[in-house]
From Swiss-Prot:
Quaternary structure note: Homodimer.
GO cellular component, one term: cytosol
Domain ATP-grasp: 119-308
Tree of life domain: Bacteria
Function: Involved in the de novo purine biosynthesis. Catalyzes the transfer of formate to 5-phospho-ribosyl-glycinamide (GAR), producing 5-phospho-ribosyl-N-formylglycinamide (FGAR). Formate is provided by PurU via hydrolysis of 10-formyl-tetrahydrofolate.
Binding site for Mg(2+): 267, 279
EC number: 6.3.1.21
Species this chain originates from: Salmonella paratyphi A (strain AKU_12601)
This protein's pathway: Purine metabolism; IMP biosynthesis via de novo pathway; N(2)-formyl-N(1)-(5-phospho-D-ribosyl)glycinamide from N(1)-(5-phospho-D-ribosyl)glycinamide (formate route): step 1/1
GO MF term list: ATP binding; magnesium ion binding; phosphoribosylglycinamide formyltransferase 2 activity; phosphoribosylglycinamide formyltransferase activity
Gene for this chain: purT
Substrates-to-products reaction catalysed: N(1)-(5-phospho-beta-D-ribosyl)glycinamide + formate + ATP = N(2)-formyl-N(1)-(5-phospho-beta-D-ribosyl)glycinamide + ADP + phosphate + H(+)
Record NCBIfam families: PRK09288.1, purT
Protein name: Formate-dependent phosphoribosylglycinamide formyltransferase
Amino acid sequence: MTLLGTALRPAATRVMLLGAGELGKEVAIECQRLGIEVIAVDRYPDAPAMHVAHRSHVINMLDGEALRHVITEEKPHYIVPEIEAIATDTLRELEGEGLNVVPCARATQLTMNREGIRRLAAEELGLPTSTYRFADSEASFHDAVAAVGFPCIVKPVMSSSGKGQSFIRSAEQLAQAWEYAQQGGRAGAGRVIVEGVVKFDFEITLLTVSAVDGVHFCAPVGHRQQDGDYRESWQPQQMSELALKRAQEIARHVVLALGGHGLFGVELFVCGDEVIFSEVSPRPHDTGMVTLISQDLSEFALHVRAFLGMPIGAIRQYGPAASAVILPQLTSQNVTFDDVHAAVGAGVQVRLFGKPEIDGTRRLGVALATGENVEEAVIRAKKAASRVTVKG
């Protein structure tokens, strides 16, 4: 039984978002649909989810004392992390004191960095992964690369959106790759993972929901990456029945091992019928924004339903759909969007995130489209995204 109070009343059900970006904004909107009181927290003011929250706070979420202070002040019933850069030791302490961390503090801590989740998947669960080594100094980084071999990929153990990642083909790139990885970590310089390159036909995100009525799967989401970040995603990604079964088995093992209720974005490589585990996020995934147009319940609605203790039931997928990011490059604290009217139409939508500024390249929106097939949906989404003119 799920009892929900009314926002801004004494019996309100309160949800605190740790991270208030575009994904958190959609989670906040889904909470608002249920009359839930939303508190958005991020490291900078006027973040997207703050626009649709009842209250907001700006703190360094890696500061355990600051995190504990804001949680103690607001007394949320649910703490919902949206990003990795959080003082997860503090979350585990607070969970031990009776607070509800979504999906659970252990999942948040293990997936905060690539080392925790890779060791869980490969060493504890025995799932197929790429070859890998970890390094915490430039000397051990060279040793790790020698063990893995060329070509390989280096990533900070804690980063997002491709920051700090390099594709290494030769020893001449090592010094630059190490320096770039040290600059790109979400918590500053530190450990890196060196991964062998996996031969694959395509990558998928398998949006997996762990809820009171069991584990549920959305149709697989295919996506194209560039510079470590996604550019387009589509659903459903066609794959063999055997590969889909194996993908679902891997995802089920991972989410049950992590524990808790919520939606998980399980990233996998697919080569023929073979499936290799890559990463997992214990929260909605950026490639899953396609579900805003492709499903009866988006990944954000599914996440909220699951952590509130509601059953999920059958997830309806409407048919071929795609998303394409709006990714301008400029510097401005007063961004405007022109020609939006030319982007939208029948079966085509645009979401603008409301980020307060841009300095360089930044994802400021996404175009969503349906089509007769996935290829058509991708073309329509890309065309819509290209028609939006971003000005400073």
